[in-house]
Amino acid sequence: MKNYSGILSYTQSISYQLGIGENLDAFILKSNSRIMFWKNKMGLRKWFEKNRNFIWINNPQAKFDIEALNSYNNIFLNNISIFITGCNSSLIPFLKKNKFEIMKTGKEAILNLDYAHFRNKSLKEIIRIGFKHGNIIEVPYSDKIRDKLEEFKSECTHSNEPQLKYLYNDILLPSNRLFVFESENGAWLGAITVRIMDKEKVITDLILRSKMATKGTMEALIYSIFGKIKQEGFISWSLGEVPYIIYDSPKLTKEFLINFTGRRLKFAYNYLGLYNFKNKFEPEWQEVYTCGKPKLNLTTFVKAASFSNMTTLVRSKFFYNLYSSGKAFRNNEIKRKPVNSDYSKVS
């Protein structure tokens, strides 16, 4: 029995040799999603779901035949637990029919390319300021450009923090389109990668902003991409999901607890800043679901958080904030201490 662990993308350009056969590969490609296989090992993670094996499918954008996956149960030792994140509403009837448990865990920002998303005067001014500092270009894929984008990530906001993994396509693929905000001296100040979902829809993968970016950089970039793909005949553009912005869940349900807990972790993952940025373009917010079979256990979310590096990010930011608070307190105490505390010597 091989130890299956890794990730297979929706495109063949990234290949992890899992040895799982062509049929399952076809299922993965058909579902246009990312799929991860993680077989439990003895040790710290044993308690999560006992010996139940765990498959995580992220961001499926098309209906797929669940039987194509179930037929490969013999790959694993015993039972199988399927965890699907990033489901849009079109998948929900199919998943309900296949006895998945379903909960709302976020919303996706959709731009209608026939709608005036940039009519706000303050947004127009920000875009105008952005265009003063450079130009937007589309950069064709090459190995050199892929490597340059990886280097650019180290220059971006939050690059010194633990990075999330597997929640989106985090490297440039041949099937991606790359748009860059380039300064007058040729430096990259912002980058967005998108992929063509079908003849109507475009989906955002990466949104990267340099630490050196000026005001309006990302707004100008989005404005330019919007115009470009509209001219090409597309109908909608997804700016991606914002998690934890579900506020109408019945209290003390699993859906409520997941969203409530996620919002408490804003110090580590600033979902609200992400929401405010995307919301300035007046998108249509469509609900995004997380689905599980046979059911959604809270421990499965913990497992996914660990695998995606979220727990590492939370731990890092928690101790950094704790250290910063302690340092600020000590500095404040030093400032408050009088230079000469022996008042009897003051005439």
Feature annotation, model-predicted:
Residues 78-82:
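Short active-site oxyanion
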Residues 66-77:
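Short, basic/hydrophobic alpha-helical segments
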